[in-house]
Amino acid sequence: MRGTSFILFAVVVILGFLNANAEPLANPAPLANPDPLANPDPLANPEAFDLLGLVKKVASALG
């Protein structure tokens, strides 16, 4: 079993070195939305999770 584990470890190490030495793409495709402030998500609600309100509700329920 030690031999199999060593072989798998060696394969992972070799693949890691190959991946680390791979050249990046010359001109990668731009992100779909590079500036999140330019086109905010219309479904995002900053008030959806009110932590302070939740703490106050729990404190009032316990006390």
Curated annotation (Swiss-Prot):
GO terms for biological process: defense response to bacterium; defense response to fungus; innate immune response; killing of cells of another organism. Keywords: Amidation, Antibiotic, Antimicrobial, Cytolysis, Fungicide, Immunity, Innate immunity, Membrane, Repeat, Secreted, Signal, Target cell membrane, Target membrane, Toxin. It is found in: Secreted; Target cell membrane. GO terms for molecular function: toxin activity. The keyword Transit peptide does not apply. Belongs to the MCD family. Mastoparan subfamily. This is Venom peptide 2a. It comes from Eumenes pomiformis.
